[in-house]
């Protein structure tokens, strides 16, 4: 009877070992891999680096051009397509929040640029006014100097008349 019990325990231990893989992370299957369009067969025993390369290569060909664009709308469109391929809970709402924040920041930057341009114009007008004021003062000084010189000449003439 004890032999039977030992035999059953041995069978149970062996069956548990057969059910557990030696390396559970050796095979990677994710929903993300299965959703890519370029992969038609299951890829077995891929390494993490290979999995990333397979996902990147499966992206549409125009993505590199769209990601090189400086237009934020292209980035948003790419992210929306990624959310279609790789659904993420709350992903769309988070993207909308980011777009709203971006738009708010951009309008703030545009307002600051407008204020800066107005300030530059006002500064230029002030500098022009100051140069006009300086030249007006110089004109007044020149007139006063010439008037003083004229009066000095007349005084000299009067002195000469008095002396003669």
UniProtKB/Swiss-Prot annotation:
Subcellular location: Nucleus; Cytoplasm, Cytoskeleton, Spindle; Chromosome, Centromere, Kinetochore; Cytoplasm, Cytoskeleton
Keywords recorded for this protein, A-Z: Cell cycle, Cell division, Centromere, Chromosome, Chromosome partition, Coiled coil, Cytoplasm, Cytoskeleton, Kinetochore, Microtubule, Mitosis, Nucleus
Gene Ontology terms: cellular component: condensed chromosome, centromeric region; cytosol; DASH complex; kinetochore; mitotic spindle; mitotic spindle pole body; nucleus; spindle microtubule
Coiled-coil stretches: 104-164
Disruption phenotype: Sensitive to thiabendazole and osmotic stress.
GO BP terms, alphabetized: attachment of spindle microtubules to kinetochore; cell division; mitotic sister chromatid biorientation; protein transport along microtubule to mitotic spindle pole body; spindle attachment to meiosis I kinetochore
UniProt cross-references to InterPro entries, sorted A to Z: Spc34 (IPR013966)
One Pfam family per UniProt: DASH_Spc34
Principal place of residence: nucleus
Subunit composition and interactions: Component of the DASH complex consisting of ask1, dad1, dad2, dad3, dad4, dam1, duo1, dad5, spc19 and spc34, with a stoichiometry of one copy of each subunit per complex. Multiple DASH complexes oligomerize to form a ring that encircles spindle microtubules and organizes the rod-like NDC80 complexes of the outer kinetochore. DASH complex oligomerization strengthens microtubule attachments. On cytoplasmic microtubules, DASH complexes appear to form patches instead of rings.
Protein task: Component of the DASH complex that connects microtubules with kinetochores and couples microtubule depolymerisation to chromosome movement; it is involved in retrieving kinetochores to the spindle poles before their re-orientation on the spindle in early mitosis and allows microtubule depolymerization to pull chromosomes apart and resist detachment during anaphase.
Family, per entry: Belongs to the DASH complex SPC34 family.
Name of this chain's protein: DASH complex subunit spc34
Originating species: Schizosaccharomyces pombe (strain 972 / ATCC 24843)
Higher taxonomy: Eukaryota, Fungi, Dikarya, Ascomycota, Taphrinomycotina
């Amino acid at each position: 009877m004890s032999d039977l019990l030992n035999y059953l325990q041995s069978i149970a231990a062996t069956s548990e070992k057969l059910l557990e893989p030696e390396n559970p992370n050796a095979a990677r299957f994710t929903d993300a891999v299965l959703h890519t369009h370029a992969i038609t067969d299951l890829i077995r025993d891929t390494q993490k680096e290979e999995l990333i390369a397979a996902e990147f290569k499966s992206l549409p060909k125009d993505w590199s051009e769209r990601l090189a664009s400086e237009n934020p709308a292209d980035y948003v469109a790419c992210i929306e397509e990624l959310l279609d391929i790789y659904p993420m809970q709350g992903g769309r709402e988070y993207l909308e929040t980011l777009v709203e924040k971006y738009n708010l920041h951009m309008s703030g930057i545009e307002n600051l640029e407008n204020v800066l341009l107005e300030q530059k114009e006002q500064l230029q007008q002030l500098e022009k006014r100051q140069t006009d004021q300086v030249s007006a003062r110089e004109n007044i000084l020149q007139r006063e100097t010439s008037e003083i010189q004229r009066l000095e000449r007349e005084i000299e003439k009067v002195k000469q008349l008095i002396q003669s």
